[in-house]
Every structure is written in C-alpha cells, then in structure tokens.
Amino acid sequence: MPTLAPSGQLEIQAIGDVSTEAGAIITNAEIAYHRWGEYRVDKEGRSNVVLIEHALTGDSNAADWWADLLGPGKAINTDIYCVICTNVIGGCNGSTGPGSMHPDGNFWGNRFPATSIRDQVNAEKQFLDALGITTVAAVLGGSMGGARTLEWAAMYPETVGAAAVLAVSARASAWQIGIQSAQIKAIENDHHWHEGNYYESGCNPATGLGAARRIAHLTYRGELEIDERFGTKAQKNENPLGPYRKPDQRFAVESYLDYQADKLVQRFDAGSYVLLTDALNRHDIGRDRGGLNKALESIKVPVLVAGVDTDILYPYHQQEHLSRNLGNLLAMAKIVSPVGHDAFLTESRQMDRIVRNFFSLISPDEDNPSTYIEFYI
C-alpha cells in the first residue's frame, strides 16, 4: 500500500535523476503533489487512482482550480477514486525547476535542461513508481495538461486505463509556436532576465513575465467575449483618447490585461514560464513515431476528446483531428462557450456533464444503464 500525502495537503516526493529525451539529466528531482480520496485496488490489481494534469501556469491543487468538478460526489468523485495531481517537472510550485536549488548549493537557473511534454510524463511515471503505484484508472487534463494526458496514453498504455484529453492538439502548430515564442522573447528581453540566472540578483524579470501573460491571456479567452465585455470603453477615470498617449490612460481591456499580468507575476516564476512554454513548442505526438496519424492510430487506450468551439489557442478542428485518428476513441464532446480556451476551466456545468459521462463510460453503473455521452462532430 503506497504511503500517500495527507488528503488535500501538499507533499514532496523524491524521484531520483530524470533523463530528458534530448540527453540531459535533472539530478535529484522532486515532484510536488496533492491527493484526495482513498487508495484502493481491485481484484485484478488495478488501482482507483485518477491522475489530473494541470495547465501551463497551474499547480497540483486541482481542488482549487477545478473546485466544481473534484470532491465527494462530484464528477471526479473522491468517494470512489484516489485523485492525484502533480506539479509538473520544471514548475515553480514545489517540483524541481529552474528556481530550485541544484545539488551544488546554487540555483539551477539556466542550467536546468530544456524539457519536452514526454519528459514531463516520464518524470510523473518515475513519481508513480516511487510511490509504488503501477496503474491508474484514468488520466485527465486540459491544455498543456491535455498534451501530457495524450502522451501518457501513447507512452504507457499498460499503466493508463483511460484518458480524457481536453482543449489541445496532437502537435504544436506554427501559429502556436509563434505566439508562444513571442511570450518567451518578452521575458528574455527583460533586462532583469540575465539569461535565466536572475535568482540571486534579487530582481525578477517581472516586466517581461507580465508582457508574456498579456499576450497569452488573449489566446485563452474568446474574441467575442473580450469585445462584449470591454469594447472600446475607457478604464474608469482614464482617457486613452487624449492629445498625447500616456501609459496610465488606458482602455478598459488594457486595465484587465494589466490585472491578469500582475496576478501571475505575484505567483509564478519567469524561468518556469519560459521552460514550460518551450515544452509546449516541442509538443508533437508524431515525432519519431511515423507521423501524427500513425502515432494517434497506435494509441489503444480509450480516449475521450473535448474541445471548445471558440478556442483561439487550440481551435476545435484540432480536437476533431484527434477524434478522427485515435486508435480507440471513447467519445467526442464540444464545449459551447464564448469564453474560449479557458472554458474547460470555467464552464463548470458542461464540464461536469462531460466528465461524469467519461467516468460512466469507463466504469459503467449497472444500476444506471442509460449513461450516454453527447457527440458534436
């Protein structure tokens, strides 16, 4: 029986050295995680563990950012499942990353290796191995977490019972790489960046990180939603239409983006942001597997795919591509929302229905045979 973190509390697990697919080594790595629900195994020895994968700037406390979905009696039912959410390797919320201390007593900084989505999954596999968990009932994740979920199904089919892949693609598109590289450049152009070795300077590249967040946040929201909320309105008591442009005289949407930037700067590390954004740029399920469609067809883990109809960052046609080529499509669903990419986090009613049906499909309730999933292709 694995010794797990107390329910709802952050715990750190040592996983040893992590070798990246590009040939680097992250020595003495640690993974931070949260756990909810009791661990059990069935008579075949398969566990009731559900592994949740967070998005780019998320963390392991899924009960916070998916509060409407995770808990006793909820869609991700902790009365039934042992739910585990890790902080990704390279992150800044407890797992080893650029802002962590290297074994030599100094910060990792820019010595921290570049990582891929596959490296992130391999680190999580080492984490499960360290806990003594050999199987999981399901893996669920959206955005960068969806990319990890898809790679889990491709890399470790003997471990994963089923997967729910949300709001992501089979590989990074040129547009995604471009918009994400612009965010990286904003941080690297901050004079406090110091090539990633700023941790001992006492000055963080906050301006660059804030600029990156402004760019990113526009891709997380729907164009129509942003326009309907703000239009061309001026921020209260400010005048962006004066005779000279002044930075403190803003449109309302500028104030909103400033607010989002300030929030992220207070809680996230720029080094981790660059590292994880670069990992998203490297995402390609087909690399060294014969191309996208061949790689998807080879995935035999049952996979539910869901996307958002107004997603700018990962347009819905990318989830349609997944659904048409996966080797074992469990179901396909569309989240209908003006919100855009973030709808998998904010549209709780639709997500509740999708996730409940996902678990009903992988663990049918004999007392409720009418379980179904809605298809929107």
UniProtKB/Swiss-Prot annotation:
Enzyme Commission designation: 2.3.1.31
Gene3D superfamilies: alpha/beta hydrolase (3.40.50.1820)
Any one Gene Ontology BP term: homoserine metabolic process
Catalyses which reaction(s): L-homoserine + acetyl-CoA = O-acetyl-L-homoserine + CoA
Result of knocking out the encoding gene: Mutant cannot grow on minimal media with no added methionine.
Domain of life: Bacteria
Enzymatic class: transferase
UniProt subcellular location: Cytoplasm
Main location: cytoplasm
GO annotations of cellular component type: cytoplasm
Active site: 143, 311, 341
Pathway involvement of the protein, from the record: Amino-acid biosynthesis; L-methionine biosynthesis via de novo pathway; O-acetyl-L-homoserine from L-homoserine: step 1/1
Keyword vocabulary terms for this entry: Acyltransferase, Amino-acid biosynthesis, Cytoplasm, Methionine biosynthesis, Transferase
Pfam family, any one: Abhydrolase_1
Signal peptide start-end: none
Keyword Lipid metabolism attached: no
Amino acids binding substrate: 213, 342
The AB hydrolase-1 domain, residue ranges: 48-347
SUPFAM superfamilies recorded: alpha/beta-Hydrolases
Family: Belongs to the AB hydrolase superfamily. MetX family.
Quaternary structure note: Homodimer.
Job description of the protein: Transfers an acetyl group from acetyl-CoA to L-homoserine, forming acetyl-L-homoserine.
Record protein name field: Homoserine O-acetyltransferase
Source species of the chain: Corynebacterium glutamicum (strain ATCC 13032 / DSM 20300 / JCM 1318 / BCRC 11384 / CCUG 27702 / LMG 3730 / NBRC 12168 / NCIMB 10025 / NRRL B-2784 / 534)
